[in-house]
Amino acid sequence: MSPKTETKASVGFKAGVKDYKLTYYTPDYETKDTDILAAFRVTPQPGVPPEEAGAAVAAESSTGTWTTVWTDGLTSLDRYKGRCYHIEPVAGEEDQYIAYVAYPLDLFEEGSVTNMFTSIVGNVFGFKALRALRLEDLRIPTAYVKTFQGPPHGIQVERDKLNKYGRPLLGCTIKPKLGLSAKNYGRAVYECLRGGLDFTKDDENVNSQPFMRWRDRFLFCAEALYKAQAETGEIKGHYLNATAGTCEEMMKRAVFARELGVPIVMHDYLTGGFTANTTLAHYCRDNGLLLHIHRAMHAVIDRQKNHGIHFRVLAKALRMSGGDHIHAGTVVGKLEGERDITLGFVDLLRDDFIQKDRSRGIYFTQDWVSMPGVLPVASGGIHVWHMPALTEIFGDDSVLQFGGGTLGHPWGNAPGAVANRVALEACVQARNEGRDLAREGNEIIREACKWSPELAAACEVWKEIKFEFKAVDTLDIL
């Protein structure tokens, strides 16, 4: 290098490492309506100040890297950088902080959940200066929301398609989840739908295995639901899982489902990926298919309180990517889910405008600007004794899904479906009459048993079954 070049470089660019907080911690910054806002739970390594940790998150998830680079001078970092604009300690937790970060909208590709997550959570979670990091919530600005199609149809359109109003929808996951032949699988589907359920479902890991190839399953399930429809006069559906090893194969399965004339298909959106999910959601809107979403693998990401991504963020991402149903926990069943937290993200799925409410874990006000809503699905370890609580907790705009709670009935699949339908109708009628489901739930179910032997048998089988474990992911002390 010539002396002349050295002089010019030293004037325009100073190499070396500097603290992130000098550039990316900006407590005086006023957030813009177009910013994506993030709330991170940050646990710094010993000796790392919280301001430096928060700034590091902002830097590494936007324009920064570990050292100064001369190409910084070729762009406007002030325009494009993420900013940590506020930090607060977490009450009752040692060395944990909530760091609020604002990202300029120009950092993100329009209509791409994949790109949004690649930026915000793609690399920073392995950063050595942090012991742990969790993305608690995102505020998606309306300008960005409007770049997404969202759910293929939404709650009201689904009800109109099914001609079912004024109650939760009822479903059942076919069990055993693996090992049945396609014909026996279709038989179970028919019996459950004939007994009074609205939907039956492929389990999340039912794809196209040697014991039951996808095309055979689709054909037998279509035959089952058409037969049940003809006999009951109700529109029925089975969630045909289109998840596959490639996007091309996934779309081939969705096209075949449409050709069969069935109303709904299914996708495992986390294992399948957001790009595949958005592709399928667009196809479903264009071709009149409803889309059921399973959240398989979510607990790997969201269950630990100090590290990962909270499910409320994954729920928002799903609403943007597209899905008409998504599993959302039960509060009362076998799967993780504290009541206030669950109801917080249920509102984020269904409602058009949700106010900030830290008592339910909602860090930001969210405006969906008329994007269709998503039906939450309660599924996992629930049975007829849970029906009053589920109806009271989730309300009409939900899907209550009983797998073992249908197929485990001592008299068979169809009586199991009858028991669930009778229990639901009894709870809805009692609620509409002004009775308190939370206080009188067991009494309401016992009264219904008097005129439904199927329900009475189910109540006897599951009268002692409870899943009483403390939730791992709980709300912070405010």
From Swiss-Prot:
Q: Which PROSITE patterns does the record cross-reference, listed alphabetically?
A: RUBISCO_LARGE
Q: Where is this site: Transition state stabilizer?
A: K334
**Reported cofactor(s):** Mg(2+)
An example Gene Ontology molecular-function term: monooxygenase activity
Annotated positions of the N-acetylproline modification: P3
Residues recorded with modification N6-carboxylysine:
K201
Question: Under which EC number(s) is this enzyme classified?
Answer: 4.1.1.39
User: What is the active site of this protein?
Assistant: K175, H294
Name positions with the PTM N6,N6,N6-trimethyllysine: K14
Localization per record: Plastid, Chloroplast
User: Which Gene Ontology terms describe the biological processes this protein takes part in?
Assistant: photorespiration; reductive pentose-phosphate cycle
Q: Which reaction does it catalyse?
A: 2 (2R)-3-phosphoglycerate + 2 H(+) = D-ribulose 1,5-bisphosphate + CO2 + H2O; D-ribulose 1,5-bisphosphate + O2 = 2-phosphoglycolate + (2R)-3-phosphoglycerate + 2 H(+)
| Top class in the EC scheme | lyase
Coiled-coil regions listed: none
How is the cofactor bound here? Binds 1 Mg(2+) ion per subunit.
Main localisation? plastid
Q: Which UniProt keywords apply?
A: Acetylation, Calvin cycle, Carbon dioxide fixation, Chloroplast, Disulfide bond, Lyase, Magnesium, Metal-binding, Methylation, Monooxygenase, Oxidoreductase, Photorespiration, Photosynthesis, Plastid
- Name the PANTHER family on file: RIBULOSE BISPHOSPHATE CARBOXYLASE (PTHR42704), RIBULOSE BISPHOSPHATE CARBOXYLASE LARGE CHAIN (PTHR42704:SF15)
Protein family per UniProt: Belongs to the RuBisCO large chain family. Type I subfamily.
Q: How does it assemble?
A: Heterohexadecamer of 8 large chains and 8 small chains; disulfide-linked. The disulfide link is formed within the large subunit homodimers.
Instruction: Give additional notes from the record.
Output: The basic functional RuBisCO is composed of a large chain homodimer in a 'head-to-tail' conformation. In form I RuBisCO this homodimer is arranged in a barrel-like tetramer with the small subunits forming a tetrameric 'cap' on each end of the 'barrel'.
State the protein's purpose. RuBisCO catalyzes two reactions: the carboxylation of D-ribulose 1,5-bisphosphate, the primary event in carbon dioxide fixation, as well as the oxidative fragmentation of the pentose substrate in the photorespiration process. Both reactions occur simultaneously and in competition at the same active site.
Name of the protein described by the UniProt record: Ribulose bisphosphate carboxylase large chain
Query: To which species is this protein native?
Result: Drimys granadensis
What lineage does the source organism belong to?
A: Eukaryota, Viridiplantae, Streptophyta, Embryophyta, Tracheophyta
